[in-house]
Amino acid sequence: MGSFVVGAVGMANAQKIDAKAKKILDDITANYNSKKNSYFKFSFGSGLNGQVTKTEPGIYYVAGEKYKLKIMDTEQIFDGSKIYNINADDMEVTIAKPNGSSTMFSPINYLTTYRNDYNVTYNGKKMVNGVNADFIKLTPVKTNGIKYVYLFVDSVKKQMVKLEQHGTNKDVAVIAIKEYKENQELDPNMFVFDKNKFKNYIITEL
């Protein structure tokens, strides 16, 4: 499931950000940041040669800097200090400090990374999942394994609709948001990693 991992960066170039696209993304970011927490239910599609060949369900909870992302048997938790990658298939957990290469492809991660890492262009309107969405294209300023990213957003509701990540190796990863909720009463331990629940797992701290 490496296709939803954002890669490390290489050579630098001058960044270009379209003003209209920036305002749309900034408005969406401000909307999500104004909430106590947000919940996304989505489908995650992956494949080769630009074609999605596999689709899996996913969920994403975020509150401030903390988040929990789950796609099938792979889960990632960030408790504000460390990232916990949990793989139920392999019964393994890796624990690490956050960095660009350890960030999974989530419904909103590009709302942060575009500010420094991508050239941004506004490409007009496109109907996506019944929404007349604004179409924004990101291309990396530095070599990072990604060819381009398409963001489809509802600028009226100030919400994400769909994301497409296309790799230089022709891998594709797509998140289509199916349901969104905000300001829920979450379990206090939502973003806590409890080692006692993973006694039979191999736990590695990097």
List each language-model region with its residue ranges.
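An acidic-aromatic
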Residues: 57-104, 173
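N-terminal leader/targeting segments and the immediate start of mature chains
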Residues: 7-52, 65, 197, 202-206
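Flexible, surface-exposed loop/linker segments and immediately adjacent secondary-structure boundaries
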Residues: 98-131
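Gly/Pro-enriched, hydrophobic low-complexity segments
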Residues: 123-125, 129-198, 202-206
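Short, surface-exposed charged micro-motifs
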Residues: 57-59, 74-75, 119, 148-152
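Sec-dependent N-terminal signal peptides
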Residues: 1-4
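Beta-turn initiation residues at beta-strand->coil junctions
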Residues: 44-46, 71, 87-88, 164-167
